[in-house]
Amino acid sequence: MDQTRRRNHHKRRVTKKLINEYPELALDIEEIMEKWIELLLPIENNIKLLSLLKEKGYSLYIISNFHLDAYNRFLKKQDWFTLFDGAIISAKEKLIKPDLRIYELLLERYQLKADECLFIDDSLNNINACKNVGMDGIHLPDNSKLEEELKEHHII
C-alpha cells in the first residue's frame, strides 16, 4: 500500500474510532480530521529565534516525521519555512525518527559534519539517536524554553 493510501486508511480508521466513541461530535470530528493541518500554529517566539539564527550565519535544517502532503500544505501556508536550508521528511524518505539512517541521510545529503550539528526535538528517543551519530542534542519537551536552551549552549 503506498503512503497516501496508507495515510488515508489510517485517518479513516481513527475518525471512525473517534466517532464511535463520541457520536454526538461526529461532524466536528470529521471537520477536524479533514482540516487538522490548518489548525497547527507556529510558536511565534521560536520563529523569531530562527530568524536570529539565520542572521548569525547558522544553517538550519529539518528532520520531520510529517506526512509528505501535510508538510507540503504546511510549507505553502507558513512562509518561515524559507528560513531552512534543507529538509528530510520521513514520508518522502521512507525513514522515521529515531532510525539512525534518517540522521545520517541529513548529514550526507547536505554535507554536514555531525560534531558541528545541534539537533532539537521534543522526543528523548530522537535526541539519543542523534547523539548516536555524533550530533549534539537538546531535548525540548516544552517548546517555550528554546531561547533559554540556545543561550545555555552559547548559540545566541
PLM features per residue range, with description:
Residues 2-32:
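A metal-dependent, Asp-based hydrolase signature
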Residues 7-8, 53, 62, 87, ...:
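Generic structural signal for small/hydrophobic residues in well-ordered secondary structure
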Residues 67-68, 75-156:
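Asp-based, Mg2+/Mn2+-dependent phosphohydrolase catalytic module
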Residues 20, 24, 52-55, 108, ...:
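Secondary-structure boundary motif
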Residues 11-15, 71, 103:
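A general structural signal for well-ordered alpha-helical segments in protein cores
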Residues 1-4, 70-72:
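A short acidic, helix-capping loop that chelates divalent metal ions and anchors anionic groups
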Residues 30-61, 100:
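Short, acidic loop-to-helix structural element flanking the phosphoryl-transfer center
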Residues 48-84:
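A mid-sequence interfacial segment
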